[in-house]
Amino acid sequence: MSTVRVLLCMLGLCLQSCSSRAEEPPVVSEAMNTYYTRQSRISDVMNDSAFGDYGRLIFPVNTGYWSGTTLEQLQLTWYNYIDPDKTVEVCNYLRAHANNCFIDIYTEVEKQANPNLRNTGVFFFRGNRNAPFAICNAGGGFSYVGAMHDSFPHALELSKQGYNAFALIYRPGDAYEDLARAIAYICDHADELGVSRTGYSLWGGSAGARMAATLGNSANLHSLTGRTDLPQASAVIMQYTGYTTVSQYDSPTYACCGTSDGIASWRTMQSRLESLSALGIPTEFHSYSGLPHGFGLGTGTVAEGWLDDAVRFWQQQSGATAICSATANTKQSDTIYSLNGIRRNTIQKGINIVNGKKQYIK
């Protein structure tokens, strides 16, 4: 009996050991490593040797438009609701993918001829191979590029949903030319980059929204690239801009803005989308009560979740289906609203219009 007891005890210890191993946390991948925290100095991120020369492009080259010593202290002119945790997440993502996250869109010969071209490029937030791509364009009044709040977070969230997203760093004085070059470069290198050449979207906030709308117009795309073989964007996603030009050649457009925006009037955006809708171009418009200019993803505000709405609009125009489930976590206590069959888990106060038809007001 003693021998049996010993064997049973040994078996129990073995099973307990196996159970303990099974409950051990998974090995953290490189992409999940914490290289930076809220207290990390911005200068340390920019000068991290892993980034090489392009580290200086992570934050605005035009230093007069931003302030702060650490990541949590970052402030950008004309922007509100900057999320320190998202800033840290973006920086850690870039550091984890430092070997392949930055792509030059101009050749070395071109940069030698025009040194200002060294202040350009795209940061690549990878999604699923051969999935559609988006180019995100930050605003900054055509004076600087506020990517850390107005394009990097958008690109990161899109990549989480399986889409390939590029955040463009452009020359403020030659923004349209640089976006045209980025579109051409990505389309020409689609196989190499592992992205679909068709069904892409252009995103932008403020000045970046003007860029997206302008290059989303097929006539402008052909004029600025000098080519007719490039496909037109399947959708343009715009935030807080006073852009008013309307054309039959414009892409389907999603737009959102805050009602307390002192720079870009929500009424101007609504009027433009109504004009596009009258031309038969698909549109979706949202205004958010009380929000000022430059709210970005709108985390913690009534606009939170707008990016998921915009993705669905893009899917509808491109004919694509969702690659991954939405990244937003829905709590049991959240109120669910429906907009034209679209479910939201955030309270959206304001005016919401799809193809010229008002859906609801909160």
Model regions and ranges:
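Catalytic nucleophile-loop/oxyanion-hole region of alpha/beta-hydrolase
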Residues: G146-D150, F166-G194, G298-A303
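Primarily recognizes the serine-hydrolase "nucleophile elbow" in alpha/beta-hydrolase
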Residues: E177, R181-D250
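C-terminal catalytic histidine-bearing segment of alpha/beta-hydrolase fold enzymes
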Residues: E24-I58, L279-A320
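N-terminal cap/lid segment of alpha/beta-hydrolase-fold proteins
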Residues: G52-R129
